[in-house]
């Protein structure tokens, strides 16, 4: 069986070492204010995203990623867990009705909630299972005014 991308010879040599500001990839904005836009992301930008939550997470964490991997939210979260040595649970989208079941089934301990995700979860009817999950950390962007109510209801930092 041939390994994907393996040609049996040495990898091509670089003309120069990679610098932190060199282009690593193109990621896309969410399109909140219009069509999605491509953003040139350097190695330093992605490294900074990957290490921004280093104090809160470790190798035992599993991050639920419900954001596309072409978006900074998906890419940065995946890189974060690579840096930490943790794992990811990758799902195709956010759905209020299945969010907590996915958290429980996947064993996810952290998640990033963007925009309307937090209000949608708060508007769901209270349940005896609101605190029956492994989630410890929720990174909310933007931080909603009722973040304390979210923490109290769901037992999440």
What do these predicted regions represent?
Residues 1, 67, 92-99, 108-150, ...:
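Adenylate-forming
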Residues 1-20, 125:
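ANL superfamily adenylate-forming
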Residues 2, 37-40, 65-66, 87-93:
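Short beta-strand->loop structural element characteristic of the AMP-binding/adenylate-forming
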Residues 7, 11, 20, 24, ...:
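Conserved structural elements of the adenylate-forming
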Residues 17, 40, 112:
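Short aromatic/basic micro-patch
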Residues 26-38:
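Conserved adenylation A10 loop of the ANL superfamily
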Residues 47-62, 70-110, 120, 124, ...:
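Conserved AMP-binding/adenylation subdomain of ANL enzymes
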């Amino acid at each position: 069986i041939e390994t994907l991308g393996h040609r049996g010879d040495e990898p091509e040599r670089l003309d120069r070492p990679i610098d932190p500001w060199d282009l690593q990839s193109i990621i896309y904005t969410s399109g909140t204010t219009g069509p999605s836009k491509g953003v040139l992301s350097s190695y330093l930008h992605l490294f900074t995203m990957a290490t921004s939550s280093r104090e809160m997470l470790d190798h035992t964490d599993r991050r639920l990623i419900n954001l596309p991997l072409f978006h900074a939210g998906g890419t940065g979260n995946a890189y974060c867990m690579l840096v930490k040595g943790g794992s990811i649970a990758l799902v195709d989208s956010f759905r209020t009705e299945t969010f907590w079941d996915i958290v429980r089934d996947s064993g996810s301990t952290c998640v990033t909630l963007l925009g309307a995700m937090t209000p949608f979860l708060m508007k769901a009817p209270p349940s005896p299972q609101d605190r029956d999950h492994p989630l410890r950390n929720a990174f909310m962007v933007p931080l909603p005014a009722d973040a304390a109510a979210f923490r109290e209801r769901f037992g999440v930092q």
